[in-house]
Amino acid sequence: MKTAVVYLMALAIATAPMLIIPACRKNPPGSGNLIGNWAISNYFDGPARSEAVTFTINDTVYVGTGSGSTKRLNDFWKYSLDKSYWIQIADFKGGIRNSGIGFAVNGKGYAGLGYDGDTYLKDVWEYSPDSNGWARKKDFGGTARIEAVAFALNNYGYVATGYDDNYLKDNWQYDPAADSWTQKAGVLGAKRKSASVFILNNQAYVVSGYSNGAALNDLEVYDAGTDKWTTKRKLTNVTDSSFDDQYTSIARWNAVAFTMNNKAWLTTGENGSMNSHTWEYDYTTDQWTEKTGFEGTARTGALAFTLKNRGFVLTGRSVTDVFDNVFEFQPDVPVNANDNY
């Protein structure tokens, strides 16, 4: 079994059947009587890393680039639930980088932006699973940046927020058919970097992030059909009811988000210290419910993905380590307080 790799670099900025082992850390944050269990899945077969990118095409997830233990990376890997291992694919042709973006549209994957150790980047590359090759596409329409969010809606890609030595809130749409970028309505609320994004009900939700020394506590939802943003309930205690008493623990940056069963989950990240609290969001009620905290080592700069309605969290870093482990979240299973690893 692989273990965490000592993190030496200071940065400027599954089934076949799939192996699932109960995760291990006793009494994760917010466990108590909360529901949800974290199980160790198949380890990522590439080098341990953080600040990588991911996209999903036809029930296959792709993961690449990022910061390893001693250097930035440009390798790429794929995984599907009908195999029990990761397969290396063609290296990312844009070169080494961390803190970039990834999304998938119409059976193709897109990756770009980020930081190569010297320069903020704005190049964008398209991956074809059929040819296992990368092709340079039109540069991103906004400024070169790091720590943006990316998502896909209605056969278009979107890149929003980020940092170019200033915090940003612009929002750009990519049309793969025309290979063109068009600026759209900017994200409401503060300019930010290191936010998280998830898709529910064919709308994009941008949550939290970092701006001017603090974690943000807002949730903004984007409707691509109308090109409008709506502010949802803030992540703070604003009612006399008990459901939002602990909402302040949701605010963080460099967290991950994933969806299952028409709900979203937010976990990991940081807010002064590493954050393992896990929260479930129900868009029909605009409410968050705390679930069992992430049971692996608390981390930031991780990735998350959903395959066949199953949610996974992988990679990331702590203050001293980078990780290659993968966890599956089982939302309706009680936490096993006797898990060990």
Model-derived features: positions:
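Sec-dependent bacterial lipoprotein signal peptides
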Residues: 1-22
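Kelch-like beta-propeller repeat domains
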Residues: 24-341
